[in-house]
Amino acid sequence: MLMQGGKSFPIRNGYTALEPDDYIFLEKFLDSTKANMFFARGVILVEGVAEVVLIPQIAELLGRSLEDYGVSLVSVNGLSRKRYAKVYRSNDKAEDSTPLPIKVACLTDLDLWPDEAEKKEGNEYGFKEKKQPNDEGKGGNLGYWLSLNTQPKIDEKKQKKAEFDGELVKTFISNDWTFEFCLAKYGLAEEIFEALTDNVEGVVELSGDSHLRAVQLYSMIEAKGSGKSEVSYSLAKIISKYSGQPEVFRTKLPSYIVKAIEYVTEALPEVPVAEH
């Protein structure tokens, strides 16, 4: 039982969209670092270290401090994100079931790879191998390549990621491949290059095409392996140069990130923003 605004909201079995096995999972993994998700005014569920490090800083630079708005950032892995989201959904089969009055933004990656990233002869930008399935049709990674998915399949993938949306739960899917790829593509390429190399001189050697440049930078991020978190921390410091310039900074961000932050805080002033 939780209290919000002087009202009680039961979250036991039968009162939320959670299944019995979801409760077992949450009892095991809902540690003290995630418990505040029930007492916040808003929640952002994220799946990666980069989001954990950068989303609070991005929100701050947009003039929408998560702390000021009582928003909790909760890190979950991809498979468990839906379980956490279901906590906030009411059970439509129970007459007296009421959803928790907490806005929840779920940030997730599209996870479809562009052809420009394929490692093959003649492609200087490629770094990911395209793998065919075995003789039994199993394995491989063809399903992850953007060009090998029809638009209906892509739409189905997006719908699956957002299958528990409704009431106050809303999923925001990356405009392109991943969170970091989008940051590189839509305006922060130079800053990411600096975070990766500790200099900005070499950025002129990157492709002049924003998409190819993002592929190059994401290849460099992937090559960091376990050191990717250090890149995120460096980037958080570098983008602090946009402090006091929310309108300028906003133009350098992919739209899905801006919309997610607005959803759990409040709308930003009306300014022209390019749709990606």
For every predicted segment, state its role.
Residues 1-276:
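Acidic, divalent-metal-binding catalytic cores of TOPRIM
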